[in-house]
């Protein structure tokens, strides 16, 4: 949209790895992100973005990115089927074995 206007453009960078920004336009595009230094040398991010779809609905994604990777959350993202009962039971057995100190080499 060539006629979109910037409504919000806020940026705060403390210079020590901590930052926050927020950006919004008149055509419904919005993003915000906060960053902090991580305990394992990584940067930790938490944020969201949204934008209008052609049908007029709004697509929105929230996320966390840290030592565990990028973890998005949105109604737009596909969800896999649940694990079958036998797989869930095997995972429970494996967790019990880990707690007992049992390892397999």
Curated annotation (Swiss-Prot):
Residues 16-81 form the Chitin-binding type R&R domain. Residues 1-21 are annotated as: Disordered. GO terms for molecular function: structural constituent of chitin-based larval cuticle. It holds the Pfam family Chitin_bind_4. Keywords: Cuticle. InterPro entries: CHIT_BIND_RR_consensus (IPR031311), Cuticle_Struct_Prot (IPR050468), Insect_cuticle (IPR000618). GO terms for cellular component: chitin-based extracellular matrix. It comes from the Eukaryota. Arthrodial membrane. Transmembrane segments: none annotated. This is Cuticle protein AMP4.
């Amino acid at each position: 949209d060539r006629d979109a206007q910037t409504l919000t453009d806020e940026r705060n960078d403390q210079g020590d790895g901590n930052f926050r920004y927020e950006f919004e336009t008149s055509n419904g595009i919005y993003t915000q992100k906060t960053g902090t230094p991580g305990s394992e040398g990584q940067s930790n991010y938490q944020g969201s973005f949204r934008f209008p779809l052609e049908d007029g609905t709004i697509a929105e994604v929230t996320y966390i990115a840290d030592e565990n990777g990028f973890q998005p959350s949105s109604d737009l993202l596909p969800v896999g089927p649940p694990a079958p009962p036998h797989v869930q039971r095997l995972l429970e057995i494996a967790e019990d074995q880990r707690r007992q100190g049992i390892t397999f080499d």
